[in-house]
Amino acid sequence: MSTSWRGRKEPTAGELLLVNWVLVLLRGIPVAIVVFGGLILHTVLRIFEYPFLGSRRPLTQYVTQVVCKTSLFLLGISISVEGFPMKERGAVVANHSSWLDIFALNATQKIYFVAKSEVANWPGIGWLARATGTVFIQRKALQAHKQKNIFTERLLAGHKLLFFTVKTALCLGA
């Protein structure tokens, strides 16, 4: 019995059949159009939203939710929510196993992610994270007071901050 959640050997790119690549294109291209089209709409709305509302985002949060729900639908992934999402400001803690977690969590709640500062510079993902209001932190003790102030400011603005637990993206037994 394996200590990992994986039941068999992972396929390599060479083992993927032509039909798999066709599915990647048939699902991936529409998702890319939705995500980057949503980013354009999000940016245009934010241009008008920011001067009047500052860090509050009553319009662009809905764009993020619709983009994530639509993307999951296009990928053939359904979402099931148990319980009731927190309605007020506060902190949410979740495990993180893949990039799909971000879509699923954004699709079901109006949240802002807290991420390590390096994410802001990642190609593509950094752009999306910055646009959607991710809070970037430096994991250094010297920055703790500054980061506490940022968290306080965002919570007072009514934000719900989402923290991923550290190192949960690693598989067991690796």
Show the residue positions of the predicted features.
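Soluble catalytic domains of membrane acyltransferases
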Residues: 73-174
